[in-house]
Regions:
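Short, conserved catalytic-motif segment at the N-terminal edge
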Residues: 25-85, 106-108, 190, 268, ...
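Bacterial Sec-dependent N-terminal signal peptides
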Residues: 1-25
């Protein structure tokens, strides 16, 4: 009997050691593949540096930084450094806050947005519903280039726009040396109000509602947009490196720069939001403005993956997340959820965005500065890719040409670590 027990124990030990060895091999194999893809991007000047975080099944399998802040190779990217999230802000700030409003204030998604936001009550947008606008099917314009309205033909700044001197009229910084007139936000709102509406019922991406959501948050909750997010999500989840206007909180050497802007700001955009409209909103906006490192974002995505729960606390109801992250109009050619992006509907798997490996239940969002966050609940996986592909200019297109984000997501999903 003792011999049998001894032999069983030895087999169990060998099996466990074999499993641990197999696990280590898979992790090293995943890291090697990710390294190869990211380094190829750096070598082809898709971006000077990046962060990648991959969570699979039960733990973080990779959390790594690559390259430098810029191509001069002076400041190496580290895991605590912050990237400009661009439109990823739409799901990790404005949609996140709106989901909480939906729960706490019983918002009816089929009611008109104008019932909640009086700004558009007597406009061509008065009949648009939250369901339509959040899924980009209301015919609203994609974007307004506000930055093209602040300078005269001779290049000088117009009155009540920007100033190189901060005072009681020009209060909020756009950059270290440009300050925004306190009434400029009203101009942005008026322009949104007056934009045309085209082809209601057809899918057309629009970011305009996300400029309006922060005011809705304040109207219903009594808290500013950033305070609401901090108090309901970021602070109780222990997220310390996720913020608007990072220059107020962190040293510049911990913030990755974006673009050498020769047209609008006429300086390197560093520590301030890259998106021009969000910048003119004072850096706090629902369309863009968040900065973070990958580790901070992982907590939010883990909460999404765990049906609204994080470390034993329920932040959102499972049914809320399921509603917002599912296709809103599944019988149409619109792939979108409510605020969230979804896989494209291409019939050829190799052409499917963002990856041929991700399931139809997956969701996430990309960002213009070179980011992607994606959650796949079926594979119990999420991936975070942060980069500054717009350095030195937004004309850098190698990130798209090399299909880097899709390749990374392919590898993240393929790395089956359940054994």
């Amino acid at each position: 009997m003792k011999k049998v027990f001894f032999l069983f124990s030895m087999v169990w030990i060998v099996t466990i050691r074999g499993q641990n060895s197999f696990s280590t091999h898979i992790i090293h194999s995943l890291e090697s593949k990710i390294d190869s893809i990211v380094q190829a991007g750096i070598q082809n000047k898709a971006y000077p540096g990046a962060q990648v975080l991959i969570f699979k099944h039960d733990s973080v399998r990779l959390n790594k930084s690559y390259g430098f802040h810029t191509y001069d190779s002076i400041v190496r990217v580290e895991n605590h450094h912050l990237y400009d999230l661009a439109s990823v802000t739409k799901i990790l700030a404005s949609t996140l806050a709106f989901m909480k409003l939906y729960e706490d204030y019983n918002i009816d998604l089929n009611r008109k947005v104008s019932d909640y936001i009086p700004l558009i009550k007597n406009t061509n947008k008065k009949n648009s519903t939250f369901m339509e606008v959040l899924s980009h099917q209301a015919g609203w314009l994609p974007y307004i280039e506000h930055q093209k309205t602040v300078r005269r033909k001779n290049g000088k700044l117009k009155g009540r726009t920007l100033s190189s001197i901060q005072n009681n009229r020009y209060t909020k910084p756009l950059t270290d040396s440009l300050f925004i007139h306190k009434s400029y936000k009203k101009k942005i709102m008026r322009r949104i109000k007056r934009t045309p509406v085209e082809k209601i019922g057809e899918y057309r991406y629009s970011g305009l509602l996300f400029f309006l959501l922060p005011d809705l948050v304040e109207k219903l909750s009594g808290q500013s947009f950033d305070q609401f997010l901090d108090s309901h999500f970021y602070d109780p989840m222990g997220i310390e490196r996720l913020t608007f206007n990072p220059s107020f909180k962190f040293p510049k050497e911990e913030i990755v720069p974006t673009e050498k802007d020769s047209l609008f700001r006429k300086t390197l955009v560093h520590g301030w939001v890259h998106d021009e409209a969000a910048g003119l909103m004072g850096g706090v906006s629902g369309n863009a403005g968040l900065f973070a490192n990958a580790s901070s974002l992982a907590k939010l995505l883990k909460m999404f993956l765990d049906c609204g729960q994080f470390e034993g606390k329920q932040f959102l109801k499972p049914e809320t997340l399921e509603l917002f992250t599912s296709r809103t109009y599944p019988n149409s050619d619109n792939r979108r959820g409510l605020g969230f992006d979804k896989p494209s509907l291409d019939s050829i798997p190799s052409e499917r965005y963002p990856s041929e490996k991700c399931t139809t239940e997956s969701y996430g969002h990309s960002g213009f500065t070179g980011n992607l966050v994606w959650v796949d609940p079926v594979h119990q996986c999420f991936m975070i890719f942060l980069s500054n592909r717009v350095y030195p200019t937004r004309e850098q297109r190698a990130l798209y040409r090399l299909n880097i984000r899709s390749s990374l997501l392919d590898e993240a999903i393929k790395a089956d670590l359940a054994f």
